[in-house]
Curated annotation (Swiss-Prot):
It is an enzyme of class 3 (hydrolase). GO terms for molecular function: abscisic acid binding; endonuclease activity; protein phosphatase inhibitor activity; signaling receptor activity. Its main location: cytoplasm. This is Ribonuclease 1.
Length: 154
């Protein structure tokens, strides 16, 4: 089955800076901005571009231990970025993959809007409990706010 969420957030951080900080440089920034979120992220396949697979060890803010991420698409001109979670205990044994697609849109005031579509592809007709999706969306919001605060301060 497929379950989908769409979230938008506004920021005073300029679009290019937010794109770099939230997506391209997240492995460097997140441990500084929100150390409870991830302990480490290591590339296990690829060079950091499309097709790269990373093993992320999650921090104490998560009830899960690991997730394996694959970078599916990067478009620095359009400010879009897509990655999939393809492994780890975060998939609960009922999810095949979680696809995250981000678009950062510049706003006239020099800030930006982040649009995030998350597609949960479950195994067979498994259904992810609504509270799990709500929890994941809230955690993503906390990560966004932590990265935004870090970028505003640096």
């Amino acid at each position: 089955g497929v379950q989908k969420t769409e979230v938008e957030a506004t920021s005073t951080v300029p679009a290019q800076k937010l794109y770099a900080g939230l997506l391209l440089d997240i492995d460097d920034i997140l441990p500084k901005a929100f150390p409870q979120a991830i302990k480490s992220s290591e590339i296990i396949e690829g060079d950091g571009g499309v097709g790269t697979v990373k093993l992320v060890t999650l921090g104490e803010a998560s009830q899960f231990n690991t997730m394996k991420q694959r970078i599916d698409a990067i478009d620095k001109d359009a400010l879009t970025y897509t990655y999939s979670i393809i492994g780890g205990d975060i998939l609960l044994d009922i999810i095949e993959s979680i696809v995250n697609h981000f678009t950062i849109v510049p706003t006239p005031d020099g800030g930006s809007i982040v649009k995030n579509t998350t597609i949960y592809n479950t195994i067979g007709d498994a259904v992810i409990p609504e509270e799990n999706i709500k929890d994941a969306t809230e955690k993503a919001g906390l990560i966004f706010k932590a990265v935004e605060a870090y970028l505003l301060a640096n």
